[in-house]
Amino acid sequence: GATGDLSARKLFPALFQLDAAGLLQDDLRIAAVGRQQQTVEAFRDELRLKMSRYMRQEMNTEVWHRFIERLDYLAADFAEPRAFGGLRGWLDDGRVSLFYLATPPSLFTTICEQLNDDRCLTGPCRIVLEKPIGESLETSSEVNETLGRFFAEQDIYRIDHYLGKETVQNLLVLRFANRFVNSQWDQSCIDHVQITVAEKVGIEGRWAYYDGVGQLRDMVQNHLMQLLCLVAMEPPNSLEAESIRDEKVKIVKALRPVDPATVKEHVVRGQYSQGVINGQAVPGYLEEEGCATSASD
């Protein structure tokens, strides 16, 4: 998914900032894989334009030139046999390879199987998957079953990038490192909790992905569920990952399921209309670029 929105907004800027901070090994290499047929020079030029729009800080020219020396591009159609044959030649079985799947969830299984068929998983390797993992309980189980065939559980990283936001990380500190707040964080002092995620952007050219996945899968069952758990969980035994996870699981198990027959009583859904953000006119959902007849009407 190297040419996708997530890569341009989050992944490459993060790698660039790590490089700028001197936190990447000198011999680390980045293989960007996407479906678009283009030269590595064209990919680098387009990536710089995108990153300059999305990054808050100015891009240092010296760091950029160092960064692109690490960066190669491979055009590959994941559904075609030998899609990753070219990638295999870039890998070193004596070093750890990290595969980051910034793609729609429908491609996760296919990509894992292709990587295996093209012998890209023969050395030590890890895999990172962005949410949502699957589009239903059934497809999520299928993805996890496939992952288990090719990777050890400790080498699988299921990522929710909201957890990396500073405000979200500070929730743990606010709740459990502040004795005054911690002692008042209960039903006798808190009447109710509302979690609002107000976005400044729409789908921005991601119609093909977004209208098929929908807001519930894209935001609620991952980002907002994680926020809910951080707000409602009991103090963990420690701030280690496993202890925090165990307390989150207790919250998820305690939630009251919404019965399909009563969805309309508990859920309000809609599509945003035309409006103005920061003084700029923005289109409504059904006027966005790439709009077809809405699958989520």
Placement of each model-derived feature along the sequence:
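Secretory/organelle targeting and membrane-embedding segments
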Residues: 1-128, 133-297
